[in-house]
Amino acid sequence: MLNFKGKKRVDKSDSKEEPETGKRKAQVLAVWGSPGCGKTTISVKIAKYLAEKKKNVILVISDMTVPMIPCICPMDELENIWSLGNVLAAPHITKGLIEENCIVHKKIKYLAMLGMLRGENEYTYAPYEAEQALEFLAGLRELSSYIIIDCGSYIANDILSAVALMEADAVLQMVNCDLKSISYLASQLPLLQEPKWKVERHLK
């Protein structure tokens, strides 16, 4: 079980992650697509499903325009409430720093979250660079078996989402069935033509 600061003690009999065959590295899934296509909803459902299967999972909600942590569950069900901004603003991001700033859900033992809080935006904290985003992802892999990253739609201006798309083990690409989504893909897919984006890992 994830054992972050502020976490209440639970019975030891129910505190172990279900064993898996062989040792495997942490898996990172980035969820990306057009605005309003349900990225956050799907990210939350996947994270909750894994947690209910007793898999350690960290859900990262990268949106700094509309902080979603207050929208996905009542704040009184959370503890150790800190902001993703605290992590990304640090000159050097470590596993310990990430662990200290993870939000813990009181009722879902295997789930931890990171995201911006109500009233915050991209200017609330010091700006960060791709190097910090890479350190952040590396630290997440050390902390949990599964990492779900709810990416922002506008990757040209969202460093964390862009780095997540490049570094994730798989990318779930989502769109709505409407003209707005078609226009979105026509605008954004040309940005992903370079090999570094590894579009062959995109699940559509």
What is each of the regions a protein language model found here?
Residues E20-T65, I69, L140:
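Walker A/P-loop phosphate-binding motif and the immediately C-terminal alpha-helix
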Residues T94-K107, A112-N157:
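Cytosolic-facing regulatory segments adjacent to core modules
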Residues E17-P19, N101, I159-S161:
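Short beta-strand/turn micro-motifs at beta-sheet edges
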Residues M1-V28, E77, V87-G96, S183, ...:
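Acidic-aromatic/histidine active-site loop/patch
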Residues E135, E142, Y146, C151-K204:
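Conserved catalytic-core segment of NTP-binding enzymes
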Residues L29, I58-V60, A112-L114, A170-L172, ...:
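Hydrophobic/aromatic beta-strand patches that form the interior of the parallel beta-sheet core
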Residues W32, D63, L117, G152, ...:
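Anionic group-transfer/hydrolysis microenvironments
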Residues K53, V57-A112:
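Phosphate-binding loop that captures ATP/GTP phosphates
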